[in-house]
Swiss-Prot record:
It holds the Pfam family PseudoU_synth_1. Coiled coil: none annotated. Homodimer. It catalyses: uridine(38/39/40) in tRNA = pseudouridine(38/39/40) in tRNA. Belongs to the tRNA pseudouridine synthase TruA family. This is tRNA pseudouridine synthase A. GO terms for molecular function: RNA binding; tRNA pseudouridine(38-40) synthase activity. GO terms for biological process: tRNA pseudouridine synthesis. PANTHER family: PSEUDOURIDYLATE SYNTHASE (PTHR11142), TRNA PSEUDOURIDINE SYNTHASE-LIKE 1 (PTHR11142:SF0).
Length: 246
């Protein structure tokens, strides 16, 4: 039986989603251990997005297979019981067809990046938003968005260690909302390059600081060179919001 789960987590204390040989503090491995504790079955949990260390999730989707047909509420409650000491929660469980794959069946992924633009330090939003002291010209940031949306070669916006075969991606939506001092950047695509969202955010912030005009984003894009784009925004401001499968 294949189970599809929706997961929420605070990424602050984890090395990221994916298991690593030298470290057991990944969200994937912690979930697999929790599932084993109640089912006594070794499973592999496949996630829709392999979030980096510090990145949070409001609606990460994953799947795994069990030989036992449990009621979905039992699966949810049992996993959460064994996650009680971790900042991870399963918020929804459903049974699904065996041809469903959390990663490869995804049609669109949605991310949110949170910025707080003020001089005072953060308290409630500490490790949950990027504190930018310099006053930002949000209007210019919004103007720059049009040069990023659409189908492009995003070589300037990918990490050097990115293993994706192609730098061509389509950003379906990119929008900025501003309610001083809070700036929310929402972005969606079928898939993203490694660090693509965080580099886009870092570049938009540099535009907002006045380092270059909005139209310079086009030059950055056409350069196909990582050194032309802005800094990589911190991981702790990024949230994996949800995944569409239809």
């Amino acid at each position: 039986m294949r189970y599809k789960i929706v997961i929420e987590y605070d990424g602050s204390d984890f090395i990221g989603w994916q298991k690593q040989n030298h470290n057991s503090n990944s969200i994937q491995e912690i979930l697999e251990k929790a599932i084993f504790k109640f089912s006594k079955q070794h499973v592999i949990v496949y996630g829709a997005g392999r979030t980096d260390a510090g990145v949070h999730a409001l609606g990460q989707v994953a799947h795994f297979d069990l030989t036992t047909d449990f009621e979905t509420y039992i699966v949810r409650n049992a996993i959460n019981y064994h996650l009680i000491s971790h900042a991870i929660a399963v918020v929804h469980v459903e049974k699904t067809d065996t041809d469903f794959h959390a990663r490869f069946s995804a049609k669109r992924r949605y991310y949110l990046y949170k910025i707080v633009n003020r001089y005072s330090p953060l308290t409630i939003d500490r490790n949950r938003a990027w504190l930018v002291h310099t006053p930002l010209n949000v209007e210019n940031m919004i103007k720059a968005v049009c040069y990023i949306k659409g189908n492009h070669n995003f070589s300037s916006f990918r990490a050097k260690c990115c293993q994706s075969k192609s730098p061509i991606k389509t950003v379906d939506n990119l929008s900025i909302t501003y309610n001083h001092p809070y700036i929310d950047i929402n972005i969606s695509a079928i898939s993203f390059l490694h660090h693509q969202v965080r580099i886009i955010v870092g570049t938009l912030v540099e535009c907002g600081k006045g380092y270059f005009p909005p139209e310079h984003i086009k030059t950055i894009m056409e350069a196909n060179n990582r050194s032309y784009a802005g800094t990589t925004a911190p991981s702790y401001g990024l949230y994996f919001v949800k995944v569409d499968y239809s």
